[in-house]
Amino acid sequence: MLYLTKISNAGSEFTENEQKIADFLQANVSELQSVSSRQMAKQLGISQSSIVKFAQKLGAQGFTELRMALIGEYSASREKTNATALHLHSSITSDDSLEVIARKLNREKELALEQTCALLDYARLQKIIEVISKAPFIQITGLGGSALVGRDLSFKLMKIGYRVACEADTHVQATVSQALKKGDVQIAISYSGSKKEIVLCAEAARKQGATVIAITSLTDSPLRRLAHFTLDTVSGETEWRSSSMSTRTAQNSVTDLLFVGLVQLNDVESLKMIQRSSELTQRLK
């Protein structure tokens, strides 16, 4: 039985919860090998029994049988299309419709946000916010997509009165790192945690007595070992990707948390500065 085809064609027959299950299975069929009914139920906010009943409605004995059948169908389909379909990003191929691409991208980003927020140590995050709030000077380092995340954070921090350097040039990043002092903070953003330039800057900052805060993945890495504090980010992207989409989503969620936490710590003055910034930029229009 072609379950993927049956799921695609039976949309009008599904209840609200069944449609949630169908959408999830279609968007994540390439990753079902590692998905259990318990995980799926938790992510979708439904009961495990709803998933079992959905599988039985399609003609399978239970979720395990449906999952294995879908994996088999997906593998067979991939073998047929691999000769012509180009792999564009993670599980997205050139044969996917824009609607399927949208679902896959949205789910990838949703998972990055959910998993990153679930794994954050919020007591550690509060401590990091307090450390940053007392820093005379903050340096933010990053490369590529991580540099974009860093630049966004630097703008936010400057808006509420922090002295921040966030340079794109790696030579300048290294130069700033060696001039940091005790009490200063370096926020190093690198998902891999192994980029030579970022590790070099972290080493220099630590040597000068600055506090190094790494926004990185859970994987053991040189940056993770160097950092005084780490904030973990999770991304489901594979090595085969066209851009760090869900990685940036996870990183932005962490940097936005830092910003809002700092605003909350000094709410009256921060809000005054945000208001003044808004008034000044309005005058430029």
From Swiss-Prot:
An annotated GO BP: regulation of carbohydrate catabolic process
MF GO annotations: carbohydrate derivative binding; DNA binding; DNA-binding transcription factor activity
Traits of the deletion mutant: Cells lacking this gene show an abolition of the extensive lag phase observed when grown on MurNAc and a 20-fold enhancement of murQ transcription.
Metabolic or biological pathway, per its Swiss-Prot or TrEMBL entry: Amino-sugar metabolism; N-acetylmuramate degradation [regulation]
Keywords from the named record: Carbohydrate metabolism, DNA-binding, Repressor, Transcription, Transcription regulation
Location of the DNA-binding region in this protein: 37-56
Cited InterPro entries: Homeodomain-like_sf, HTH_RpiR, RpiR-like, RpiR-like_SIS, SIS_dom, SIS_dom_sf, Tscrpt_reg_HTH_MurR, WH-like_DNA-bd_sf
Regulation: induction: Repressed by itself and by the cAMP receptor protein crp.
Domain HTH rpiR-type stretches: 1-77
Lineage: superkingdom: Bacteria
CDD domains, sorted: SIS_RpiR (cd05013)
Residue ranges of every copy of the SIS domain listed in the record: 128-268
Oligomer status and interactors: Homotetramer.
Function field: Represses the expression of the murPQ operon involved in the uptake and degradation of N-acetylmuramic acid (MurNAc). Binds to two adjacent inverted repeats within the operator region. MurNAc 6-phosphate, the substrate of MurQ, is the specific inducer that weakens binding of MurR to the operator. Also represses its own transcription.
Cited PANTHER family: GLUCOKINASE (PTHR30514), HTH-TYPE TRANSCRIPTIONAL REGULATOR MURR (PTHR30514:SF17)
General remark: Neither GlcNAc-6-P, GlcNAc, anhydroMurNAc, MurNAc, nor muramyl dipeptide have an effect on MurR binding to the operator site.
HAMAP family, alphabetized: HTH_type_MurR
Protein name stated in the entry: HTH-type transcriptional regulator MurR
Biological classification of the source: Bacteria, Pseudomonadati, Pseudomonadota, Gammaproteobacteria, Enterobacterales
Name of the gene this protein is made from: murR
